Amino acid sequence: SHFSLAYYKNNKWTIKQFNRFMEVVEALKLNDINIQTLHICNSPAFLNYPNMHLNGARIGSAFLGRVDADINVGLKKIGKLKCSIEEIKIVPKGFNIGYLNSYKTKKETRIAIVQLGYIEGFNIGTRQDMFRFVDKLRNLSHSIKSFFKKQNLKVTINDKKYNIIGKLGMYHMAIDITNSDVKIGDFAYLEVNPLYIDSKIERKYV
């Protein structure tokens, strides 16, 4: 059993699924089969349908703080990549950075090189399903908003945010650290979804 539309509150299909589940439970009871632990809620259902909790739940994405639901319960995203800064350079105005010369410096710029890229799972996501027309509209709306919204990839170094500049590489990235005291050996922290982190990356749980 698994809810397919529990992302939405008061969804008729979700209620129908739950009622079917309970009908099976009652049928088992009539045959003297008593299930000790009953659970049907995934993460969205656990948040949106408290009356369906029964005496167990199977949450998954909620553990990562990345669940889609119509309720804001203050979940915090977990999962960060940590990598030390191995190289620092000062480049002149008009210097091209990244594949396709995707960024040109507007002034003399101090950059930090971090040996970490998308192959480790940074800035990686799933492709949006577009089986339904409404999914296509939602994806189009998201793309239009992203087009007009300035979104810089950022890292955190010494509790401060810094912009990644240039096209993200497979194994590396460049960070604008102009007018900062960032030095070689400092650590850069990048927010990531743990589901996409490469298996070779060492995991530490705190």
Language model features: what each stretch is:
Residues 70-73, 100-101, 142:
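Short, P/G- and charge-enriched loop/turn segments at secondary-structure junctions
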Residues 59, 98, 163:
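Residue-level signal for pocket-adjacent positions within structured domains
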Residues 1-92:
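Active-site loop/helix belt of alpha/beta enzymes
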Residues 95, 104-206:
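C-terminal accessory subdomain/extension
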Residues 4, 68, 97, 158-161:
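A near-ubiquitous, low-amplitude feature marking generic local secondary-structure context
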Residues 44-45, 100-102:
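Short, solvent-exposed loop/turn elements at beta->coil junctions and helix N-caps
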